[in-house]
Amino acid sequence: MVLTLSYVAVDKTSIAYAEEAQKESEQMNKEEKADGAVSVSTPSAILMEASTGQVVYEKNCDERRPPASVTKVMTLLLIFDALKDEKIHLTDEVTVSEYAASMGGSQVFLEPGEVQTVDTLIKCISVASANDACVAMAEYVSGDENAFVEAMNQRAKNLGMKNTHFVNCNGLDTDGHETTARDIALMSRELITKYPKIYEYCNIWMEDITHTTKKGTTTFGLSNTNKLIRHYEYATGLKTGSTGKAKFCISATAKKEDVELIAVIMAAEDSKTRNKDAVTLLNYGFGKCQKYAEKTCKTEKAVPVRRGIEKQVKTKQKNPYIYVDTTGADLSGMKRRVRLKKELDAPVKKGEKAGTAEYYLGDKKIGSVDIVAVQDIREIDMKSVFEDLIQLILL
């Protein structure tokens, strides 16, 4: 027996939301142009530029609050870490445990013993915010949810998420399960910049999955909980959440031309306010931010090496320089000054600092990037001297 669930009700809601969102967006644009300022009604929020991590706007962003399903940003980050390390693969088949299937809240109604691929479960988490799929993946990656949550907290610590403590992998209300708008922005930035493949999942608007169990085969329709990806033209993701304690939260990502932003809203009174405030911040950011970004790492002059088997070492800029301006400055006037060390002492290690590239707007220094050695240079020793003498004699 095959059963297909209908999308009709969702479509009507989406149409109504689209019309309302368009009116709100037009009004917000008028308000922002009027005074250039921005404000949101929700108690905690942050706007971050993704490539640099620069904070463009903040409001009580270090207050600890329950994040609801925005927790799943970290769950997805650990899943993608495991994929990168080849501990798991998208085609792997995951057997759903009785515990995973028992999860309440938003779910895709997985049943004990049901088998789904990693790829499908990522869709269930990203699109439908499925709590049961989260636990199934946590158990598959780490053996059990507790071990997975320990890994979540360690990853948070490594990212500098100073005010975060996870108790579960899906964000269901639990005492002590808290984070902040700033910390959500940090983990969101890590996910989208390190694993842009996440966009392939969180931009799915609707898609069917198939349940195959002892009861038979049924088709279940996934519908994206993040309405912004359909109704805000620059939206790219990322994750919504709502519970009784957390109220309405979102980590909203968007990109316009070369500027990519992360807007985090926590504890909004309803989904309308949550989405409106997210769009307000994103529009504000796109109006304020302009970006200077180098595409390649420039090669610099060689630096002399004292007591090295090579007399000099080649150097290059460690990484391309990126700068985000919010003041309206003329970035075409950006100046670059290179300061190399007079010499390096052997042994020289690849990646060792050999100088600095400094960036100026007018007389103001706005940033710098290290210039590093591109190779190892060993210190000269008697063996090296003897080998050189032999070469000279043979010549």
Give the location of each predicted region.
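Domain-terminus/edge residues, biased toward the C-terminal soluble/receptor-binding domains
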Residues: 161-162, 173-178, 182-395
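A generic local structural motif
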Residues: 2-4, 31-33, 249
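Active-site-adjacent loops and short helices of periplasmic peptidoglycan-processing enzymes
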Residues: 12-199
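Sec-dependent N-terminal signal peptides of Gram-positive bacterial secreted proteins and lipoproteins
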Residues: 1-15
